[in-house]
C-alpha cells in the first residue's frame, strides 16, 4: 500500500508541475517530460524549431514541429521527414546531433520530435559572427566533422547535403555536430546511389552522373573547409546553378580557393576535391598532418590573397583528354536533348532536368523554373549562353521547355509581346494587332488607344517616371490635357486624356523623330520621321526587345491610371468657385483668336488665383 501511495504521490506531483504551467509551456509531449516554449529558434520549408525543456534531465532541447498537412503534401516531403527521424533514432555518436523522442499530436495535427539544442546556431552563422578564427580551431572542427562522417559511412549512410548550414555549434564548448539528415541515403547491399539531390555549390561532379558513393561527402567536406578558412561561400562568383554546374564538371575550383596562402591548407582541401577515384576516405583524412595539433599556439586565420594561383586540380568528371576535346568542340547537329520536369506545388516551382548527348557521353543539368516569374525563352537563352550549346537555337529549347511545363501545369501559357512580330503582322494583314500599342501611323486609333501614340517614347516622361516601351519620343505635359471643371464629368477623365493625347500626336510628329527629339540635321532633312515605317531589325535585336504582353499592359494601365489621378488632383487644385463664376463668358480681347486654348486656360487660372487670395478661407 505504501508503495502504491508513493507511486501515486509521484504521479500527482508530476502532473502538478505540468498543470500549473509555471515554466510557461505552450504545449507538452504526451508523457509530460518535454515542454515547448513560444520562442522560435529557426524555420525551414517543412518544420519550425522551438526552444523546449526536458524536465527529467533539466536541460533545454530543440522541439521540431511540422504540420501533418505539410508533411503529407508530397511524397518527397514525407520521405525526407521520415528519413531524418528514423536515421537520427538509430545513430549514436558524439559528432552527430542527438535524438530523444518523436510523436504525433492528433488534435493539433502536428508531427513533433525532440533533438539536442545548439546554443550558437549553424557553423555558417557562427563563422560569420566571428570572422577571425585560428587554424587550430578550424582543425578541431574538421576532426569532429570527419569523425562523424566516418561513423555515417561505416553504417552505409551518405549525408548528401553536408555544408556549414547543416553543421551546428555549441559555442561555449567549441563543439560541432552534423545534423539535418533529411537528404541522407542508406546504401543497402550496394556501393552507390543514383539520385541527384543536394546543394549545387557542395555537390561533387559525379553526383551529376547519378552514380556515386560516400566520396561525395568528402568533396562536400572540402568545400566546408574552404568556407571555414576563407569565410567565402563556394562559387559565390557564379550567378546561377548553370554556371556552377559548368565550372564543377569542368574541374574548375571556386575563386575562394585562390585566397588561401597556407600551403598545407591548400593541399589538404585539394585532396578532398580531386576526382572520385583518387579521393581519400574520411578515415584517411583524419591522419593528414594538417589536422594534427600545431606546435605553436599563435597561428592566426588564413584569410589572405594568394600571391600566385596554384595549379588546377585533376578534372573530376572526365575520363580522358579526348573526352574533354569532344566537349569543347561544337556539338553535332544530331546531339540529342531531352527535358523532363518535376512540379513543387508548395513553392510554385518546376525542377527541370535537361539531358544532353547520347550513348556513354551524357550530361544532366538540373535547374528550377519559377512558373510565376520565369519565361521559357529567358531560360533557354541562358542555357545556350552558359552551357555553350551551339547546335540548337533558343527558340527550339524554349519550345521543349514550354511543352514540358504544359504537361506538368495544364492550362499554362506564357504570353509574349514582340514589336518585331507585330510589325510583320502589319505587313501581312494591313492593320495593327489589337494589342499593338506603337502604331506606325500618326492617326492610328490603335496606336493611341492606351495613351501611347506612335511618337511616344519611354512611357510618360517627366515627374511620373519612364518606361522604356519604344524608341519613339514625345512629351505631353500635364497642362496640355484638357479636363472638364465640372465634378459630374470626372468619370470621363480617362477618355478625355486619351482624346488629348491623340490630338497631340501631330504636333509631336513635327518636332521629333522616331529615335528621339528632332535635331538640327533632322530639320534640314525635312522634319521628323514619325510617318515612316519601322526599319527591319535582326533576329537578335528582336529577341532583345521582346516584352511580356501581360507586363506591358500592366505597365501602361498603371501609367494611365497614375496620369489620370494626377490630372484630377490638378483640376481640383486649380479650380476656384469664385474665379469660375467671375470668368463666365469672359475672354481677354488681347489673346482671343491668337492664342491657343491652353494659353486661355492658363490666363483664367491666373485670374482665379488672384481672387483666391481674397476668398481663401471660403473653402
Swiss-Prot record:
It comes from the Eukaryota. GO terms for cellular component: cytoplasm. SMART domains: S_TKc (SM00220). PROSITE patterns: PROTEIN_KINASE_DOM, PROTEIN_KINASE_ST. Signal peptide: none annotated. Residues 439-448 have a biased composition (Low complexity). Transmembrane segments: none annotated. The keyword Transferase applies. Residues 1-14 have a biased composition (Basic and acidic residues). It catalyses: L-seryl-[protein] + ATP = O-phospho-L-seryl-[protein] + ADP + H(+); L-threonyl-[protein] + ATP = O-phospho-L-threonyl-[protein] + ADP + H(+). Belongs to the protein kinase superfamily. Ser/Thr protein kinase family. WNK subfamily. This is Probable serine/threonine-protein kinase WNK8. It comes from Oryza sativa subsp. japonica (Rice). The gene is WNK8.
